[in-house]
């Protein structure tokens, strides 16, 4: 079954792996065996890859292995926050880096791994350089990048483009010029699951970067006063409203959810010409779209530049990686096991191959031959190229910001796309939660 972003990013109620053996398998020995503990996301196929890495490590370390526990849905965020705050966190903490990690790091709740990476420079050099940005807080590294990279991609329906007789956009001006062309044929220029909020956010992430460069959003992360009122930010906010006003999105987009994959269906059925979405969308199109992908109907590319913009067109946005941190409350022995797992158990050859077989691009460098031999070679190679060549890889804003600021962001993005607030009103609302 294809997974949506929220299936990938959402976690919740804990299910001990030992209790879930019949359903999804277990990797770890009991804690009485003297090992470390590890909480991570369940749901196949990702859970199977994670469990496989733990299994392999435990077979090599029968006396000091890792006990794993799996989770599902959004309640995990509350549970892990509570556990960390109470000093009862697992040894190894799975997460997304960014704003939440920043909170833990500044509170001294997770280990500083900077010196460990200095001592293991070969490991650091083996990973995509941009994957370390969401793992870094105040110049220090607090998490191990792991698993796969998920850039946001501009998808398009090749058949629809041929039908209308137009070419994929090479600039923002091209995007705006295509809007009336598709509307005249009764085809929505862009699909959008606007009810899900974060889908709208991807447009702003790219426009901020293409117009003003990564410095615009970085100023927000660094807590600069009134950073959202940067003139380039206002320009980006204005441009997205111009796209809405031009009927650039499917009618009724505010009532369409991404979790139902209704936005995906609009693209592969030809009711929409294009869609801005994460790399996980490819698997959904492949699974649900009949022969749409296999028949060569799906096109994909990086977001085009904005004429006169300051941003590097190689830059991308999305999820640079997933992340593993070590609880500062863990014992010395548990920390030792965790670091050994990072060095010898994470992103080893079998795990890398498993991610690729499941249609993902691992954050490990040097996988070109494996990607080229995969079932989805062209798409994975394009994604690897986008991720590895990106001058900057901006983390999804709702992960990069604190939970408080992220919720304010998502609420106001809905209003922005519904044209119920102006760019300056949006900026004012977000300025009020900078640093919170």
What would you call each of these model-derived segments?
Residues 318, 358-368, 379-434:
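C-terminal capping/gating helix-and-loop segments adjacent to ligand/active sites or protein-protein/ligand interfaces
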Residues 59-60, 246-248, 289-357:
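Extracytoplasmic/periplasmic substrate-recognition and gating elements
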Residues 114-127, 194, 211-235, 289-293, ...:
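Short, solvent-exposed loop/beta-turn-alpha elements that line the ligand-binding surface or hinge
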Residues 98-152:
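Hinge/lid segment of periplasmic solute-binding proteins
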Residues 140-146, 152, 176-229:
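Extracytoplasmic/periplasmic solute-binding protein
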Residues 70-79, 172-177, 253-265:
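Short helix-initiation/N-cap motifs at beta->coil->alpha
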Residues 2-102, 106-107, 118-122, 333, ...:
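Conserved N-terminal structural module of periplasmic/extracytoplasmic solute-binding proteins
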Residues 179, 222-254:
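Glycine-centered hinge/linker elements that transmit conformational signals in sensory
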């Amino acid at each position: 079954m294809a997974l949506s972003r929220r299936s990938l990013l959402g976690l919740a109620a804990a299910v001990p792996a030992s209790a879930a053996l019949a359903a999804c398998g277990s990797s770890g020995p009991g804690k009485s065996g003297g090992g470390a503990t590890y909480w991570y996301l369940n749901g196949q196929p990702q859970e199977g890859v994670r469990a496989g890495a733990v299994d392999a490590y435990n077979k090599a370390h029968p006396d000091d292995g890792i006990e794993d526990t799996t989770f599902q849905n959004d309640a995990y965020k509350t549970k892990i926050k509570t556990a960390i705050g109470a000093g009862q966190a697992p040894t190894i903490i799975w997460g997304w880096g960014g704003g939440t990690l920043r909170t833990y790091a500044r509170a001294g709740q997770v280990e500083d791994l900077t010196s460990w990476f200095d001592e293991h420079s070969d490991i650091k050099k083996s990973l995509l350089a941009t994957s370390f940005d969401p793992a870094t807080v105040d110049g220090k590294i607090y998490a191990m990048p792991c698993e796969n990279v998920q850039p946001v991609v501009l998808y398009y329906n090749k058949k629809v483009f041929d039908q209308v007789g137009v070419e994929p956009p090479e600039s923002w001006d091209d995007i705006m010029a295509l809007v009336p062309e598709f509307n005249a044929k009764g085809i929505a220029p862009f699909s959008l699951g606007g009810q899900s909020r974060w889908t709208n956010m991807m447009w702003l992430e790219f426009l901020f970067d293409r117009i003003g460069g990564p410095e615009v959003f970085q100023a927000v992360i660094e807590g600069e006063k009134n950073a959202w009122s940067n003139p380039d930010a206002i320009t980006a906010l204005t441009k997205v409203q111009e796209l809405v006003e031009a009927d650039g999105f499917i009618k009724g987009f505010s009532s369409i959810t991404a979790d139902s994959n209704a936005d995906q269906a609009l693209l592969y059925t030809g009711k929409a010409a294009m869609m801005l979405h994460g790399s996980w969308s490819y698997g959904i199109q492949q699974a649900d779209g009949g022969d749409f992908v296999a028949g060569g109907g799906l096109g994909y590319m990086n977001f085009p530049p904005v004429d006169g913009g300051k941003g590097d067109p190689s830059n991308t946005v999305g999820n640079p990686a997933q992340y593993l941190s070590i609880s500062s409350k863990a014992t010395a022995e548990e920390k030792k096991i965790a670091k050994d797992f990072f060095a010898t158990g994470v992103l080893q050859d079998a795990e890398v191959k498993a991610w690729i077989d499941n249609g993902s691009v691992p954050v490990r460098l040097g996988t070109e031959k494996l990607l080229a031999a995969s079932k989805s070679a062209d798409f994975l190679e394009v994604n690897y190229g986008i991720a590895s060549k990106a001058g900057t890889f901006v983390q999804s804003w709702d992960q990069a910001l604190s939970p408080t600021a992220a919720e304010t962001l998502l609420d106001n993005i809905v209003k922005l796309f519904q044209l119920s607030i102006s760019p300056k009103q949006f900026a004012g609302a977000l300025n009020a939660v900078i640093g919170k």
